[in-house]
């Protein structure tokens, strides 16, 4: 749940109406640390499954494995967008949405693993009551974040124009490919 800090900076920037480079500058190291630890966790889990357990593969596309991959992909897109938003001042709305969804996907992964909703060799501590509590927390936080974006997002200025063939255009294409 390391994406909580970029999410919190995003919400604070929306609340204050200060959607400048400051919140992205403060968010980027935290997003990088969270994404880095998630990368290490996924790599170590894959190594462990292959060598120690002898499952014969690095990745089995198990629902719980995918629950860790989704915030990793959203975090990767967030890191790229934070850099461009900080340096060029573009993609503010996109970056805010990525911060919300990266955190939401990490909470969704917690819900899937802990609730017993899915059947997996990786799911543990399946407790419907705990799952309901996590789902309510997920709904409040993500719903509140999206509501804040809807109420305060109008403060976003019109982004500067950029060329069709530019770094910004390729970043948008890159982020769309990552998220698909």
Task: Specify the residue positions occupied by each region the protein language model found.
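Polytopic transmembrane helical bundles with strong interfacial aromatic enrichment
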Residues: 1-180
